Amino acid sequence: MRSQLSLMGKKEGMIHVFDKDGNLVACSVISMSPNVVSQIKVDSTDGYNAIQMGADEISVPEKTLQKRVNKPILGHFKKSGSRVFRTLKEVRVSEDAVNEASLGSEFGLEVFEDVSSVDISGVSKGKGFQGVMKKFGFRGGPKTHGSGFHRHAGSIGMRSTPGRCFPGSKRPSHMGAVNVTIKNLEVIKIDLEKKVLLVKGAIPGPRGSVVVVRRSSRAKA
């Protein structure tokens, strides 16, 4: 079952470490507290097999919890009999994996102990509304005196035929804040004691954002 799991962690930032060959490598640091099974879905009642995982438990008194969490979410956790978490993630698994799972089971970094590379998903940094030069790398117009065309997109249509602009062209719009997956990132180090995972290179999102880590779909056999 462990090979099918995706676990949630928190991006802490980036550091440099030396690899086994003495090369300086830029790494992303992901802290990963245990993910807890908060709900089990089976094909007979839900139409598919899945496990819902919860991370980042909300540890506050019951009276405070009633104020911070809305009733539908509280009812969901009460029905499953699990603790209350800030983040939930559903993972599709096989029927055998569902039969093995039990409410309250915890999964941590030990899931990736035998893994050399992982896929990481997260929400990229939001850049707000941006023009075509920043978002798509357009060259822009002349930088000289007299030019009224510096950072514009330029022509986006043709002539009287077709007499319209085709949809999907590159235009100024919101940049960032989208789901991004980076595949086959090398695992540099797993620290089970500190619950920290180091992967080579950058990962999506700002510091403190939630990322989802899974075994790489492109890993060599």
From Swiss-Prot:
Keywords: Ribonucleoprotein, Ribosomal protein, RNA-binding, rRNA-binding
Alphabetical list of InterPro entries matching this protein: Ribosomal_uL3, Ribosomal_uL3_bac/org-type, Transl_B-barrel_sf
Keyword Ribonucleoprotein: yes
GO-annotated biological processes: translation
Domain of life of the native organism: Bacteria
Database matches in Pfam families: Ribosomal_L3
GO MF entries: rRNA binding; structural constituent of ribosome
GO cellular component: cytosolic large ribosomal subunit
Assembly: Part of the 50S ribosomal subunit. Forms a cluster with proteins L14 and L19.
Family that this chain belongs to: Belongs to the universal ribosomal protein uL3 family.
Summary of the function given for this chain in its UniProt record: One of the primary rRNA binding proteins, it binds directly near the 3'-end of the 23S rRNA, where it nucleates assembly of the 50S subunit.
NCBIfam families reported in the protein's UniProt record: L3_bact (TIGR03625)
Name this protein carries in UniProt: Large ribosomal subunit protein uL3
Organism: Chlamydia felis (strain Fe/C-56)
Gene: rplC
